[in-house]
UniProtKB/Swiss-Prot annotation:
Signal peptide: 1-21
Protein name: UPF0540 protein At1g62080
Domain of life: Eukaryota
Region (Disordered): 119-150
Taxonomy of the source species: Eukaryota, Viridiplantae, Streptophyta, Embryophyta, Tracheophyta
Disulphides: none
Keyword terms of this UniProt record: Signal
A biological-process GO annotation: seed coat development
Recorded GO CC terms: apoplast
Organism: Arabidopsis thaliana
Regions of compositional bias (Low complexity) in chain numbering: 119-135
Length: 150
């Protein structure tokens, strides 16, 4: 490559760089972030007041008992299984937002089987209980004596 070609390519590169480098306009913070704050907000804090909560509770129990008498003799079997599941979610925004969530569940079961030489007996019972509670509150800004907001 000779010096003339190099100089021409260098000038073209500089011109392209100048053309593509435009002055960036000053944008508002709202435009840059892609979000807009309502005019009613005070410094953007405490504008949205909300308190939400959810909770879920589930219980299950399986009790099984079997007694039988066949030609080979009496027999019995029993099975018991219980399971519980609880979950909760809490979201609080704004000034003095409070949320409490609680859930509880229990599962109990009983299974029994008895066998004698001439007879078989079986018994099964199960009990489940679930409870859930959610409380939430949020306070708005109060006006002071002069009529100004906090």
């Amino acid at each position: 490559m000779n010096a003339t070609k190099f100089l021409v390519l260098l000038v073209i590169g500089v011109l392209c760089a100048i053309v593509t480098a435009r002055q960036v306009k000053d944008l508002s913070t709202e435009t840059k972030l892609g979000a807009s704050l309502p005019k009613t907000t005070t410094k953007g804090i405490g504008a949205q007041l909300s308190a939400t909560g959810s909770t879920f509770s589930s219980s299950s129990v399986v009790s099984y008992a079997n007694g039988f008498n066949n030609p080979k003799g009496p027999g019995a079997n029993a099975f018991e299984s219980g399971s519980t599941f609880t979950s909760g979610q809490v979201t609080a925004k704004g000034r003095k937002a409070r949320v409490s969530s609680a859930s509880a569940s229990t599962a109990t079961g009983e299974a029994a089987a008895a066998v004698t030489r001439k007879a078989a007996a079986a018994r099964a019972k199960g009990k489940v209980a679930s409870a859930s509670r959610v409380k939430g509150s949020s306070e708005k800004k109060k006006k002071d004596r002069k009529g100004k907001k906090d």
